[in-house]
Amino acid sequence: YDAFLRSFKRNVDVPHSFLLGAGASITSGIQSAYDCIWEWKKDIYLSKNINSAEFYKNYKNESVRKSIQNWLDNQGKYPLLDSAEEYSFYAEKAYPIADDRRKYFFSLIENKEPYIGYKLLCLLSEHNIVKSVWTTNFDGLIVRSAHQNRLTPIEITLDNSDRIYRNQSNKELLTIALISVYSIRTD
């Protein structure tokens, strides 16, 4: 941490880029992808085991997770625990209709405010220290924070990647989304 700060101080004349992961969203009150997966597993389990609702409400409880995972494993048609395909598989299984998935993800970010780290990135952008923020998050909080801090976010996604080739002016912050499968738009 201290070496990072020394390097950062030494290079204030060089524009920086930041990569944000799930931790930034979690500090703003948005649940992690891991928790989403377990919520979907719980919903699938409860739709097949209707009389189990009360015990399985707390899907963050380890014994509840073990019980649900045992049931899923015994079905023989679900991905292995912690496998790479769990996220997309369970999102589609829990919400096979794309608009339902969009509504689910929107419900996670609705009324959430960017935590202080987002505001700091915008402040650094105002002082031309940060020029771009790359993110694996679907929440749009860096864009919201840019608006709140009188910056113009230039949103770049996998669908409009050609926008990255542009002259960037002051008061703009490039926000590059590295995901698209279950991203949502809130406008």
Regions found by a protein language model. Give the residues of each.
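Conserved catalytic-core helix/loop/strand module for nucleotide-ribose chemistry
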Residues: Y1-D187
